[in-house]
Structure formats: structure tokens, C-alpha cells
Amino acid sequence: MQFLDDDPLIAKKDFGVQAALDAYFEELSGVLAALPREKIAAAVKICDETRRKNRTVYLCGNGGSAAAATHFAADLSKVAYVPGCARFRTCVLSDNTSTLTAYSNDESYDRAFRGQMEGLATRSDLLIGISTSGISASVVEAFAFA
């Protein structure tokens, strides 16, 4: 099997990888420096209060944001575990395709997450919505209920 870097024309070609990495890390450093640390700390406290009360963290998003919600839920329930403490209880509203498509088909996609919240969520549960635009109707509707 031949790999691309075995090709002498490709091996000699400078694709500007180092310059691209340098620019990426410089941009990333700026983004990290600009993060609102106080707001992040407040969000972590809210998540921890939800865990301590043995309440559920619901998450939702569309497209890549749905994948991010699933990944975050896995991190909360597995990685954020502290021995001797309760684990996070998580539910990703975009993961159950049967329920998601039933609400989408029978009502509207805009109500797909809200409909699930109406049947599942209780007082003191937490909803985390992920949206790159910030205006995804299905995510906004879930927050209107929460």
C-alpha cells in the first residue's frame, strides 16, 4: 500500500501546514483569553446544583449542535464523575430519533424538543441548548417551556 507521503512530488511539496497551525493556535489563544470566566463558573455551579439535587440535565441541538449535545452529555455523565458523589443524569432530546420524528411529523419540528420536555422534565431540572445561530426554533421552543 502506498501512502501520499511516499509520493516524491507530494513529499517535497510545502502545504503551509506549520503556518496554518501557528495561525490557528494564535486565534485559539485569543478566543480562550476572551472567554467570560465568571459566566462559565456560574454555569458550572448551576450544573453541579442540578447534579447534587439528583435532577436531570436535558440537552438539545440540531445538526452538529446535536452531536455536541450528545458529546457534552457523555462528558457530564462519565468524565465529570467524582468518586463518592452522584453522577450527572443526562438526557439528550435529539438522540431518540423515533420520538424526535414523531413530534416533527405529528406536530412540527419546532416543537420536537419542547414536546419531549413537557413529558419528561420536572422542576429543578436543567436544559442546555446548543445552537450556532442562537435562533433555532426547536431549541428556542424548548426554552420557552423550561
Q: Could you tell me what each predicted segment is?
A:
Residues 1-34:
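Generic N-terminal amphipathic, Lys/Arg-enriched alpha-helix
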Residues 18, 37-40, 110:
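Short, structured helix-loop boundary elements
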Residues 35-53:
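A short, well-structured juxtamembrane/interface segment
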Residues 40, 64-65:
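N-terminal, charged amphipathic alpha-helical interaction modules
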Residues 58, 65-146:
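Glycine-rich phosphate-binding loops that contact phosphosugars or nucleotide phosphates
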